[in-house]
Amino acid sequence: MTPRKLAHELLIKAEKSAQYSNITLDNALSKQNFSPADKKLVSIIFYGVTERKLFLDHQISSLSSRTIEDIDINTLTALRMGLYQLIYLDRVPPHAAINESVNLVSKKSAGFVNAILRAFQRKGSPFLPSKDNIEQYISICYSVCQPLASLFLRIFGEAETERFLTAINTANDITLRTNTLLCSRAQLLENIDTSKPTENSSSGVYAKGSVRDLYGFDEGYFFVQDEASQIAVEALGLKENDTVVDLCSCPGSKSFGAAIEMKNKGKIYSFDLHENKLSLVIKGADRLKINIIETAAADARINISKFDGIADKVICDVPCSGFGVLSKKPELRYKDPSASASLPKIQSDILDNACHYVKKSGILLYSTCTVLPTENEDNISAFLKRHPEFSLLPWKVGNIEAKSGMITLLPHVHSTDGFFIAKLIKN
C-alpha cells in the first residue's frame, strides 16, 4: 500500500460514506505502518482534494468532453488527486503527480487520465469561472455547494464572503490548550518546535504535526481546542469550587477547560445524548489528571429536576450546522443549508431547558461553531423574550470584546474558527 493508493481509496470511501473525514482518515492511518512523511502526504492529499473538489472538477470539465457524472469514481478521484498535486503541491514534481495518478487507474482509463493531466500541465494555470454569475463563481472557486455560497453572500456580501472563504481555505495550525494543572504555556512553547502563543486565549498554543507525537501528549500537558472555544470558556469567569453543567459536552474540551480554570476544584456535570461518546470525555479527563467531571447520557432538551438551580455556570455548546468550521470538517462544504433547517428549534429547546439549571446570578453560556444568524443572534433574541429573567452580560477575553454580551468570531477577522458566543446572567 502506497500513500497515494491509500488516499485514493479513502477519497472514494468518503464519497460513499456519511462519516466525518477526520474519522475516516484517522482510522485508516492507525492501521498503516507509514513514516511521518508518508502519513503527512496522505493527509494533505485527502483533505486537499476534499476541500477543493468543485474547483478541481471545474478543471476536469474545462479539459474533457465527458461530464463529471460520466466519469467513473475511480478515474475521477485519480484526476482530482493529480490536479490537486499539480496546482497546490510545489514540492511534488509534475511528472510524479501525473505518473502516480495514472498508476491508480485501470489500463482502460490510464490514457484518459494521462491526457487530461498533461493538457493541464501544458496550460500552466487553472481555469477560472466567469464572475457574471457570482454564486456560481463563489461555489467553484472556493468549493462550496451553490446553496451555501448563496447563503454566505446574503449574510456577508460579496467581498466579505471571499475574505471569509479565503481564510477557511488557508491551512491552519493545530491549536492546543495548555493543561496548567500540570505545566505552563511557556513550557509547551519551549519544547514544541515551531509553536507560538495564541493571540487572545491565555493558555493557547499553535503547533504543527501529529498531535499524539507532540511533546507532552502522553503526560496530559495539553488537549486540542480551537482558540474560539478557549475564549468561550474564559468568558465564563470560572472560579474554584464552582458547579458547572455542560449539556452537550462531547468530546469534552469545554469541560476540560472549565476544570482547569477551576484548578480541578468544584464539580462539573458533563452530559451528552450519545453514551458511547462519553468515553472520550472520561479518557480525556484521565489523561489530563482531571477528577471533578461526572458524565451521564442525557437529552439536553429534557429537564432533570435534581439539577434545577444548582449551577453557577451552564455551558450550552449546542448541535449546529458547523458552517464556521469548514476547514476542519470539509465535507460540510457540500451540505445544503436546508438540511439544517430543524436545528434552531433544537437549539431553542436546549436553551429553554438549560436555563432551569442556572442559579440566581449564575451564568448561561451559549455557543455554536456556525456563522448563521438563525442559529445565533436570532436564537438569543427569542430566548430573552421568553425568559426576561436573563440578560446579556458584556465580557472581554484578550482583545476580543463583546460589549453587547454576544459576538460572532470570524476566521478572516479573529484568526479563529467561525464561532458564536453569548454570555447571559440570571437576574
Language-model segments: residues:
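S-adenosylmethionine
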Residues: 1-427
